[in-house]
Amino acid sequence: MKEAEAGGRRRIEELDYLKCLLIVLMISFHLVFIGDSYPYAKQVVYTFHMPVFLVISGYLMNVQKSPDQYLRTLLFYLIPYLVMESGYTVMASLLPIREHIDQLTVSVFFEKLLLHPLGPYWYLHTMVVCGLAYFGVFHLWPFHPLSRMILLGLVFALLGYWGGVVSPTMAFYFLAGVVIRHSGVSILQVFRPSWLALAAFVWLAMYPVNLQSSAPGGILMAYLFVSFALAAYPVVGLVLRRPLLFVGRNTLSLLLFSPIFTILCKSLVSPLSFEPTGMLFLVVSLVICIAGSLIITWLMDLLHVSPLFFGKQRALISY
């Protein structure tokens, strides 16, 4: 396990690397042209990319912080979520996007904001809801750790199946990360590297029945993706370690701001249509989305907006 000191805490390099791969996949298939051109590949990626993100998030969320520190962390997930989801919802009522809202009323606005978010911001909504439940169970109930995790699972089931506040499947991926954290075992001891994981992943991906994150095959695909990615890291890292880790450490910025650029990149489809596979469009769009999101974050740091929006002086995390 490789660790790096960053901002006064220890970082696991492999997790930053995984987050880089996952955010690039997320942006790629939020490009409508790519999603429409490769629908099966999109379905495969959607089976595992956000579930793995949530496992990592559950593992990294430290409920042993003081209540003030922990709730401050959640607050600065909530503030960007409220700002960006509000903007996205209004935009969805004005632009002819896939999630277009025909008539935006006050009730529809708050239904999207509080219960059923649009765009990629549902991830932050899930993080805040699951994080609050996690805090409540682990701070307010003096149970044995195993009992707390069982209770947390029941709370997630209540919120998901009966309350409709979060996806129960995604909440349980978050719970998996929590369980790993409290097991006393490193996440890299749970997810072991293997080159053969690629063959098993491809075999499972050939059968549509596996392409659901709640299906046994989908859960296994998430594990196999991580296993193969970790096996490839020593090789890929020889050349691309610094840019991969830089992107991986700034996934929040990319999650928040990349939708602005995925919409703008629609205008590139026609000029780049001479390349029939769409790969040129994909590469150019990824550069624009990643660079644009990082530049916005850098400007927010420069203008001292980051303390209000992200809760820290510098939101752009350097290598």
Locations of regions flagged by a protein language model:
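Alpha-helical transmembrane segments and their immediate juxtamembrane cytosolic regions
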Residues: 1-319
